[in-house]
Amino acid sequence: MTAVQLPDFADELVAAMAARDTNRAEIPVIQPAEPFLDMAGEDLRRRIYLTENENGDSLCLRPEFTIPVCLGHIAGQVGTPRRYSYLGQVFRQRREGGNEFYQAGIEDLGETDTAASDARAIADAADLLGQLLPGTGLTITIGDQALFEAVVAGLGLPAGWQKRLIHAFGDDAALARMIESLASAQSSTVEESELGELIAAGDVTALAEHIGTVMEETGYSSHASRLPEEIATRLVEKTELEKTRLSDTAFAALKTFLSLDAPLSEAVDMLRGFAEDAGLASGPALELFAARVEGIKASGADLSSMRWRAAFGRPLDYYTGLVFEISANGAVLAGGGRYDRMMTLLGATEEIPAVGFSLWIDRIEAARNAKERGQ
């Protein structure tokens, strides 16, 4: 395997990140696999290089930096707010390009001013790219998972459907399939039997007792599979989802929201108009979005290069709010977002707000080379 060399601008980039009040994180290449498998999303999970140690523990080659930076912060019991920077190789199976490549980035942990830290993440990523690619036109696409979650909740869907739709956010094809299935009536698969009656009634406790009795009578051990309570909960949820249908009004509202696309400078007014037309309360998600836009303006960033798309998400399960990508000539050079729930899921004893971004070093290098060739 040919070694992947650091680009000639690596030292410049490291210095530029350090100048932004960051602490350099040194992350081992070999990582415990479980946190990535649990939180990284299907797109990344299927690209991870997995192995085991002699104790049978699942390990992997480092597929990204955000999760291990957070784990390192928790293990070090370091106070917040604290900003980390990194530059190193990541390892992923890819259809195009090498399977090992460099990423750099900044993770901002513990800053309680959400709007300001969101704006700073976008500005830092854009400024670093501007330093490495002077004179190159950058396009910034912004989305917000919290806005989508608020709209879905406002439509009154069952929790199971909300969870499914939120999980699919960022995967346009999967989301479209779910919305279409919600718009059409579905036949129930519940059988006419005692089990079927319990499922249809939605009585999880009675259903779990019935399943437990059947498992005992058949000698089926719950240690080999899920517990009766888990099975009962899933069966009731599945039936509830099958019976759910979006009203024509709610379906139209969801489709309209996902079609919203505007320059960032016009996005807040567009969102307020949508909420009024759809009969939805503006709520904290919209107010935070508006505050973030004001924070971006206050940072002196050029809003003319920024566009908001309601349907825009990124294929990582840990995002909770802001998501963004920065492109040049059709190539995505940076991406990031907010992941406020991840720190507690990884073991932090208190909630720690977090936002960050990664730079794709191989793509930046290709863009620099193309610029030098005058392409």
Q: Where are the regions that the model predicts?
A:
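Positively charged, Gly/Ser-enriched RNA/tRNA-binding surfaces
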Residues: 2-21, 31-32, 64-78, 83-135, ...
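Short secondary-structure junctions
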Residues: 22-27, 46-50, 305-306
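Beta-rich nucleic-acid/ligand-interaction surfaces
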Residues: 27-46, 143-153, 312-320
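Polyanion/phosphate-binding surface patch
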Residues: 29-59, 84-85, 97
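Short amphipathic alpha-helical patches
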Residues: 37-41, 152-156, 171-178, 188-193, ...
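Acidic, His- and aromatic-enriched active-site or binding-groove loops in soluble protein domains
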Residues: 46-55, 156-188
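A conserved hydrophobic position in a structured secondary element of the catalytic/binding core
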Residues: 61, 143, 359
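Internal, well-ordered domain-core segments that constitute the primary functional module
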Residues: 103-173
